[in-house]
Amino acid sequence: MSRQSKKKGRSISGWVILDKPKAMKSTEAVSKIKRLFNAQKAGHAGTLDPLASGLLPIALGEATKTVPYVMEGTKTYHFHVAWGEERSTDDLEGVVTKTSSKRPTQEEIFALLPKYTGVILQTPPQFSAIKIAGNRAYDLAREGEIFEIPPRQVKIDSLELIGTTDQGYSIFEMTCGKGTYVRSLARDMGHDLGCYGYIADLRRTAVAPFCENDLITWDALKAAIPHENTTDENCIPLKQNFSTLDGLLIETDVALKCLAHYTLNQIQAQRVRMGNSILLCDQNMPTSNIDICVTYKAQLLAIGTIDQNQFKPKRIFTTL
């Protein structure tokens, strides 16, 4: 999975599906993983709030080219909603802005769920990374600015009430599309139920195609490096000790299960490597303007657009 390069770090490629702990920022997690693997390049496929835990897909090397396709995948969340308070951030971190003595019954909650299933309009939280006139909403909110975030369409595939905690929080599980804010959902349900609500606990359990079975903890990653061979407090391993750590990576092309795959011959592969379009005459080839993957000798070669049997490469992979 790795090769020599003049650039700083190793040209290592693959996915780390990190079980992000609470209090760790997503950018911090990426930096830690990048240092641990001594990777040239790293990025994540979907931010998790610091107060949230769970599945954070982190791409290394050539896998960063597949990040947009993972971000388009469905996400699954397990979360607790506390009723009776509205908070500035719509989660535990914020200050209380409104209170109510009312607590919803299970029947009232069940009756509300269909409203929040399917394609809905949702307004992101004031404390979010949405850009308003070039500024992040959370920066404006911290400065006390008054502003509005326009609602946008999101898709919620399923929303279930699955229990109640000892503290009286309602436990939900939701599968949704890109751009859905769980904090906004808690806020909006609280308004509809006449009692206010905020997120008391949030865990992401899936980002298609990755699931809980793919998760690995930070401690497990560090344990893959013999302690006596670490070079500093960041647990950066010596070159000869990367093999165990590299074996924990998920292959780059796993992220592309959502795309159709087609095999090229040698001449076609050479043209694609040079960034040229090619004609593909497979009778099963889609004719519409969609993305597909092409491979050569069972190796991922490129992602591109197919239209009227013409394949135009958009992202070309070096040898993985």
UniProtKB/Swiss-Prot annotation:
SUPFAM superfamilies given in the database record: Pseudouridine synthase
Reaction it catalyzes: uridine(55) in tRNA = pseudouridine(55) in tRNA
Pfam families named in the record: TruB_C_2, TruB_N
Coiled-coil positions: none
Gene Ontology terms: biological process: mRNA pseudouridine synthesis; tRNA pseudouridine synthesis
An MF annotation (GO) of this entry: tRNA pseudouridine(55) synthase activity
EC number: 5.4.99.25
Active site residues per record: D49
Record Gene3D superfamilies: Pseudouridine synthase
InterPro entries assigned: PsdUridine_synth_cat_dom_sf (IPR020103), PsdUridine_synth_N (IPR002501), tRNA_psdUridine_synth_TruB (IPR014780), TruB_C (IPR032819)
Keyword terms, alphabetized: Isomerase, tRNA processing
Entry-linked NCBIfam families: TruB (TIGR00431)
Task of the protein: Responsible for synthesis of pseudouridine from uracil-55 in the psi GC loop of transfer RNAs.
Family stated for the protein in its record: Belongs to the pseudouridine synthase TruB family. Type 1 subfamily.
HAMAP family documented for this protein: TruB_bact
Stated name of the protein: tRNA pseudouridine synthase B
Organism of provenance: Bartonella bacilliformis (strain ATCC 35685 / KC583 / Herrer 020/F12,63)
Encoding gene, per UniProt annotation: truB
